[in-house]
C-alpha cells in the first residue's frame, strides 16, 4: 500500500451536518468522504510539460451540448468524472453518456463520480438518450454507467433498453458500451446483453492487480478478465476493449503483465492513459509517465496482437473512441 494511504476498518460516526443526503449533489471531498480508504495528502508532483489539456473555444459546441444534455435530463461521465478532455470533446460535439444516475455503489478513491444510495432507474432515460443521440446526429456513441450493485441484473437490462431504442432512431450509429463488472450477477447480465449486444464491449481493468485493494475496493481482477472473455465467447464478432491508468504506483513490467493477461483473455483493443487526481481528496499521482514509455507500451501492445492501442498521457477509454474503433477496422 502506498505511503499516501491509510486503510481504515470502520468509519467514524458522522455529525448531523455530515450525514449522507442522497438528494444533495456531491462535490469535491464529499465524493470520497465515505470510502474505505483514508487519503492522506501527499507531496504534489509538478505536472510535466507534456500534460496539456485543450480548452473549449468560443466557437465550439461546448455550451450547446451542455444545454441539450440538461434539457433531456441526461448525465455524462465527462462531467461527473471531471474528465480533462471535456472541453475538446464537447467542443467537437461528442460525449460519453452515463446512464442509471450519478451515484455509484462502489467507492474507488481515484474516481470523481459520487458514491451513495442510487436513485430508482428512470424508465424514460432510454428514450431520452435515443432522442438526444438522434438530435445530435452522432455517428458513434459511448454509453457508460455507475455501478449498480443494488439491482439484481446490475443494470444490464437498462443497457439493452438504451441500445435498442438508440438503434431504432439512429440505425447507422455505432454503439460502444463501457460497463461495470456485474460482480455477483455476471451470467445473468451476459444473458441479457446477448439479446442486443453493442458494437464494441468495453470494461476497464483500471490498474494492476497489486493495487486493486486500494484503488478498486469491491472489484476483482480475475472477475474483470472473465467478464470480457466470457462476453467474447458468446459474441465472437463483437470487439472487446479495456483500459489502464498509470501513475498509481505500478511498475512498467506490471502494466505489460496486465496487457499479456488481456490478450490471453481475448481482449482486442487497449487504452492506456496518465492518472490525474481529480482533487487532493483522491489518490495522489505517484509518477508521471514519460511519452517514451507510452510509446513503448504502444509498440508492445501491437506485438502482443491488440488490433488497436490508444496510448498516451491524455488518453481515456472513451476519448476519440470513434477513431479508435475506425482504426481497428470495427467502425
From Swiss-Prot:
Keywords: 4Fe-4S, Cytoplasm, Iron, Iron-sulfur, Metal-binding, S-adenosyl-L-methionine, Transferase. Its EC number is 2.8.1.8. Residues 7-17 have a biased composition (Polar residues). Coiled coil: none annotated. InterPro entries: Aldolase_TIM, Elp3/MiaA/NifB-like_rSAM, LIAS_N, Lipoyl_synth, rSAM. Residues 21-33 have a biased composition (Basic and acidic residues). Its main location: cytoplasm. The keyword Cytoplasm applies. It catalyses: [[Fe-S] cluster scaffold protein carrying a second [4Fe-4S](2+) cluster] + N(6)-octanoyl-L-lysyl-[protein] + 2 oxidized [2Fe-2S]-[ferredoxin] + 2 S-adenosyl-L-methionine + 4 H(+) = [[Fe-S] cluster scaffold protein] + N(6)-[(R)-dihydrolipoyl]-L-lysyl-[protein] + 4 Fe(3+) + 2 hydrogen sulfide + 2 5'-deoxyadenosine + 2 L-methionine + 2 reduced [2Fe-2S]-[ferredoxin]. One of its GO terms (molecular function) is 4 iron, 4 sulfur cluster binding. Its cofactor is [4Fe-4S] cluster. It is an enzyme of class 2 (transferase). Residues 1-33 are annotated as: Disordered. Binds 2 [4Fe-4S] clusters per subunit. One cluster is coordinated with 3 cysteines and an exchangeable S-adenosyl-L-methionine. CDD domains: Radical_SAM. It comes from the Bacteria. GO terms for cellular component: cytoplasm. HAMAP family: Lipoyl_synth. Belongs to the radical SAM superfamily. Lipoyl synthase family. PANTHER family: LIPOYL SYNTHASE, LIPOYL SYNTHASE, MITOCHONDRIAL. This is Lipoyl synthase. It comes from Cupriavidus necator (strain ATCC 17699 / DSM 428 / KCTC 22496 / NCIMB 10442 / H16 / Stanier 337). The lineage of its organism: Bacteria, Pseudomonadati, Pseudomonadota, Betaproteobacteria, Burkholderiales. The gene is lipA.
Amino acid at each position: 500500500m502506498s505511503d499516501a494511504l491509510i486503510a481504515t476498518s470502520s468509519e467514524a460516526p458522522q455529525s448531523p451536518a455530515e450525514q449522507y443526503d442522497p438528494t444533495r449533489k456531491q462535490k469535491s471531498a464529499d465524493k470520497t468522504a465515505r470510502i474505505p480508504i483514508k487519503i492522506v495528502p501527499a507531496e504534489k508532483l509538478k505536472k510535466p510539460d507534456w500534460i496539456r489539456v485543450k480548452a473549449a473555444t468560443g466557437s465550439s459546441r461546448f455550451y450547446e451540448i451542455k444545454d441539450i444534455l440538461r434539457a433531456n435530463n441526461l448525465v455524462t461521465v465527462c462531467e461527473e468524472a471531471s474528465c480533462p478532455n471535456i472541453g475538446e470533446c464537447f467542443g467537437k460535439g461528442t460525449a460519453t453518456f452515463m446512464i442509471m444516475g450519478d451515484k455509484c455503489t462502489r467507492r474507488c478513491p481515484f474516481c470523481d463520480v459520487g458514491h451513495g444510495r442510487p436513485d430508482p432507474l428512470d424508465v424514460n432515460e432510454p428514450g431520452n438518450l435515443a432522442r438526444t443521440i438522434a438530435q445530435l446526429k452522432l455517428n458513434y456513441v459511448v454509453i457508460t454507467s455507475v455501478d449498480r450493485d443494488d439491482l439484481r441484473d446490475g443494470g444490464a437490462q437498462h443497457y439493452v433498453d438504451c441500445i435498442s431504442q438508440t438503434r431504432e432512431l439512429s440505425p447507422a450509429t455505432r454503439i460502444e458500451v463501457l460497463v461495470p463488472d456485474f460482480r455477483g450477477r455476471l451470467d445473468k447480465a451476459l444473458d441479457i446483453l446477448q439479446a442486443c449486444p453493442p458494437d464494441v464491449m468495453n470494461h476497464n481493468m483500471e490498474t494492476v492487480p497489486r493495487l486493486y485493494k486500494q484503488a478498486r475496493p469491491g472489484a476483482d481482477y480475475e472477475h474483470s478478465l472473465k467478464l470480457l472473455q466470457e462476453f467474447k465467447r458468446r459474441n465472437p464478432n463483437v470487439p472487446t476493449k479495456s483500459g489502464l491508468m498509470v501513475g498509481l504506483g505500478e511498475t512498467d513490467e506490471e502494466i505489460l503483465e496486465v496487457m499479456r493477461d488481456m490478450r490471453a483473455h481475448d481482449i482486442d483493443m487497449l487504452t492506456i492513459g496518465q492518472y490525474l487526481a481529480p482533487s487532493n481528496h483522491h489518490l495522489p499521482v505517484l509518477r508521471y509517465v514519460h511519452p517514451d514509455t507510452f510509446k513503448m507500451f504502444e509498440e508492445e501492445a501491437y506485438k502482443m496482437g491488440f488490433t488497436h492501442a490508444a496510448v498516451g498521457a491524455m488518453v481515456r477509454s472513451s476519448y476519440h473512441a470513434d477513431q479508435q474503433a475506425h482504426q481497428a477496422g470495427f467502425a
